[in-house]
């Protein structure tokens, strides 16, 4: 049984954590940020569990909105499974945390909470196509770069927990790609999308937000938006515009696309909370700069 726990990050249906019940107790896929840990504890309690019951935490990648509370479960005894390229940052998060603090400043703790290191004895680096057998369930790790070099999509039977590689889709809106720096690579992302497609899943569980069952239309739409945003940003990069100069125009561009589909201001605000415009501007401008320098 898979349960979706809404972490209510700034608004509802922004960040999900997934609770999977097994014969060896609950497994958590995605912890969300530490700032929403109390909501996750409440969600566990609704299903009869407390944090110390969770022995296995599976992360899609180490961004704060997906992995920020992993250390809190490790303190309660859980093992945390992570991509090899994310391992050292969770063991010693000082560099990761301080770099984010330079961006968020005084809002850092309010938005994301705290982050402590996870002992190596409670972490496992997971290679591509590694299999975890937990309580009668079989979780397969698929390395899926594009959004982040340390990204994993977790397969459970005909279900895939996609993190950010299958985009954000907040009902009743469309899918959009979260494109934060520093790792955005559109070519890798397209390859990862085809990897997901070729696994023939029945359901994708998006961290932002929830289940998707019309797989091919969803993935095709994601590719189309990635290409559109990428080309839009390539023009601005060619004009040598800064993140600060581009962000207002891009925010309006993305919002206008949502408005044309009939989304309300509140629904558009949910998208901005889950996928802030400035992050995609920074990520895609950096992508084009790296392409130019390659």
Regions found by a protein language model. Give the residues of each.
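Conserved beta-strand hairpin/beta-sheet module of binuclear metal-dependent hydrolase folds
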Residues: 1-51, 154-162
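Divalent metal-coordination and catalytic microenvironments
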Residues: 20, 30, 40, 61, ...
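Metallo-beta-lactamase
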Residues: 33, 53-65, 90-143, 149-216
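Metal-dependent catalytic neighborhoods of phosphoester/phosphodiester hydrolases
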Residues: 67-76, 92-93
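Divalent-metal (often Zn2+) His-rich catalytic cores of metallo-beta-lactamase-fold enzymes
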Residues: 76, 190-243
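C-terminal regulatory/interaction regions
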Residues: 232-294
């Amino acid at each position: 049984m898979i349960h979706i726990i809404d972490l209510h990050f700034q608004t509802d249906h922004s960040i999900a954590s997934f609770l999977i019940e097994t014969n060896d107790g609950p497994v958590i896929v995605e912890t969300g940020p530490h700032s929403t840990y109390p909501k996750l504890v409440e969600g566990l309690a609704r299903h009869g569990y407390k944090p110390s019951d969770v022995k296995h935490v599976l992360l899609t990648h180490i961004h704060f909105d997906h992995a920020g509370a992993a250390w809190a479960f490790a303190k309660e005894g859980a093992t945390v499974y992570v991509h090899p390229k994310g391992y050292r940052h969770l063991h010693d998060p000082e560099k990761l945390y301080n770099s984010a603090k330079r961006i968020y400043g005084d809002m850092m703790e309010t938005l994301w909470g705290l982050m402590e290191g996870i002992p190596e004895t409670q972490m496992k680096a997971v290679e591509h196509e590694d299999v975890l057998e937990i309580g009668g369930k079989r979780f397969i790790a698929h390395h899926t770069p594009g959004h982040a070099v340390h990204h994993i999509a977790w397969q459970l039977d005909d279900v895939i927990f996609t993190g950010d590689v299958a985009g954000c889709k907040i009902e009743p809106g469309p899918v959009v790609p979260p494109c934060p720096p520093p790792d955005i690579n559109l070519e890798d992302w397209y390859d990862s999308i085809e990897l997901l497609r070729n696994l023939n899943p029945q359901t994708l569980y998006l961290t932002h937000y929830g289940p998707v069952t019309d797989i091919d239309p969803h993935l095709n739409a994601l590719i189309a938006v990635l290409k559109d945003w990428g080309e839009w940003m390539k023009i601005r990069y060619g004009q040598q515009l800064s993140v600060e100069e581009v962000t207002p125009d891009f925010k309006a561009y993305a919002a206008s696309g949502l408005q044309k589909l009939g989304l309300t201001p509140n629904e558009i605000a949910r998208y901005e909370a889950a996928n802030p415009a400035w992050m995609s501007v920074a990520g895609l401008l950096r992508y084009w700069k790296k392409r130019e320098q390659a």
